[in-house]
Amino acid sequence: MIADIHLTHLSYTQLDTMTWCATAQVRESLCLSFDTLWDKASWSRLSVFNIPPIAPNKFCALNWQYYTAPVTLSARKIAHNQRQLQRTGVRLLLQALISELEISDTLDESNFPYRLINNKYYVCFSHTGPNDKSLNSNVAVIISHHRSAGIDIENNNVAWKVAQRFYSDNEISAIQSLPTTQRDIIIKLLWQIKESFIKIRQYTLAQGLGMDYAYLITDLLDALRDPSPVVVIANRQSDYHIAFLPIQQTVVVY
């Protein structure tokens, strides 16, 4: 068996004349290798059942059914495999976005923030694990011609106790007054905004999560009522814009 990594549910969004993002689901499936099957086929066993040898040119035309033996992996191995899947997935998505934009370029990973070698566009990745027991992950990428940008895709909610540990006092006070359903969404959106700014500003995790974005909460609540596929919020305390893509569960700071 050969692992085949591919993207599904691709979505491309142009945020302005110099900024584009893409999201997708990355899947890993198993596919048959003709060479492996042919080399390992036990014709001696087939002869026991009076099954004649099969010519190579007819081998692939057969209606094959195959099964894989169940494999028990450690939690560490599963996490490693998922990280590898996500790493490959974001780079496949970058290539898809580059192709969509009709750009001929490759990624320079020698410094952060990442940039395209020829066009010098800024690149930022994000990925998130599944919110169920499947092995699928969601991935996201942003390309900005103007300046460094941040992106965060997140399937899972952020626990209230985690927010209480990292968020500012102003944020906690404002969040506590919200109904539970709104509270959970705002906690998650703030987390995604913080993650995006961490990628832009190169904050440490604790420093970035502790930044105070309480002034954005009213605008975020308004954004939740907006049915648009992309909702853009002007950040009053910087010249960055914040885009919320609800269907893709993605936040972009650009």
Where are these regions (language model features)?
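Core catalytic alpha/beta fold that binds nucleotide/phospho-ligands
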Residues: 1-254
